[in-house]
């Protein structure tokens, strides 16, 4: 909305056109806006969650250090998602179909996560939304979205899988391969981030780093000068540049949420936050044709999800024998005696290294 206001005001006041004409300026402004909104609303929301007694449920078989987290306010992901949507409505180009798709993803997956949290925390349903129902909803939406994205992106012929660290190697993709790949990326990312969100601040920093990385790729690939200079395929789809703006909103809101989510956490994001942020990252990766870069930058999420799959598989196939002391893998390290803060910071360091490797692929090609 604001870009239209500044566009009109620029006819009367010189210099204001930078707020409507330059996407780099809007990236800065939306990140600041989402950060400030989250910081401003964080404390009132935490107080409201405490008043409504919407607190974290802690497993009895988990690390003993987690017992102190019991009843810590959760569903704080609503704060992140609201901030992102408001900021996008203020600073985004509302003619961009890609921006609206991302907002729709936030709303849909946010609704799934919210309903799951509501069942568990408010209605005291022990398992929340059944896994098969959750997966069915995610799957139907992901498949429909993948088909829509295929036809939108194929208008400019952007249907090749980009290979990192190569300037000329691209793998052509038809609709079947594209939809299958997008399905696994979106659903896998959504659930992997959800599994990672088990310690204070553990998930939000990798989410911010991956969002920042994908935002940088989106900015480069939708800028013809930068794309040609860095030997990327130019993504000239109208409105696709708004993906970078959206990523900036996620980064700003995520950093502000860390203010409240850092150890000892005052609030957790809950499924409403983690499921949605994971899905959003997957959709962005598909939009900017950087699925493999997303795999590199988000490898921490992949490892967390794989640890659960291996643990469950081992338990079923090896007569109750486990690979890890507890899954996801961050709990394994806790039970080995690592303090929670050490686990979190070391995982952040790993995520930062993966982020830098992903960025290196911009130039090392």
Swiss-Prot record:
GO cellular component: plasma membrane
Topology term for the membrane: Multi-pass membrane protein
InterPro entries, sorted: Glycosyl_transferase_4, PNAcMuramoyl-5peptid_Trfase, PNAcMuramoyl-5peptid_Trfase_CS
Transmembrane stretches, start-end: 22-42, 74-94, 95-115, 134-154, 168-188, 201-221, 240-260, 267-287, 292-312, 342-362
Record EC number: 2.7.8.13
Reactions listed under catalytic activity: UDP-N-acetyl-alpha-D-muramoyl-L-alanyl-gamma-D-glutamyl-meso-2,6-diaminopimeloyl-D-alanyl-D-alanine + di-trans,octa-cis-undecaprenyl phosphate = di-trans,octa-cis-undecaprenyl diphospho-N-acetyl-alpha-D-muramoyl-L-alanyl-D-glutamyl-meso-2,6-diaminopimeloyl-D-alanyl-D-alanine + UMP
Protein keywords: Cell cycle, Cell division, Cell inner membrane, Cell membrane, Cell shape, Cell wall biogenesis/degradation, Magnesium, Membrane, Metal-binding, Peptidoglycan synthesis, Transferase, Transmembrane, Transmembrane helix
GO annotation, biological process: cell division; cell wall organization; peptidoglycan biosynthetic process; regulation of cell shape
Pfam families documented for this protein: Glycos_transf_4 (PF00953), MraY_sig1 (PF10555)
An example Gene Ontology molecular-function term: phospho-N-acetylmuramoyl-pentapeptide-transferase activity
Cofactors (names): Mg(2+)
Involved pathway(s): Cell wall biogenesis; peptidoglycan biosynthesis
Keyword Metal-binding: yes
UniProt subcellular location: Cell inner membrane
Function: Catalyzes the initial step of the lipid cycle reactions in the biosynthesis of the cell wall peptidoglycan: transfers peptidoglycan precursor phospho-MurNAc-pentapeptide from UDP-MurNAc-pentapeptide onto the lipid carrier undecaprenyl phosphate, yielding undecaprenyl-pyrophosphoryl-MurNAc-pentapeptide, known as lipid I.
HAMAP family hit by this protein: MraY
Family of the protein in this entry: Belongs to the glycosyltransferase 4 family. MraY subfamily.
Protein name: Phospho-N-acetylmuramoyl-pentapeptide-transferase
Biological source species: Francisella tularensis subsp. mediasiatica (strain FSC147)
Originating gene: mraY
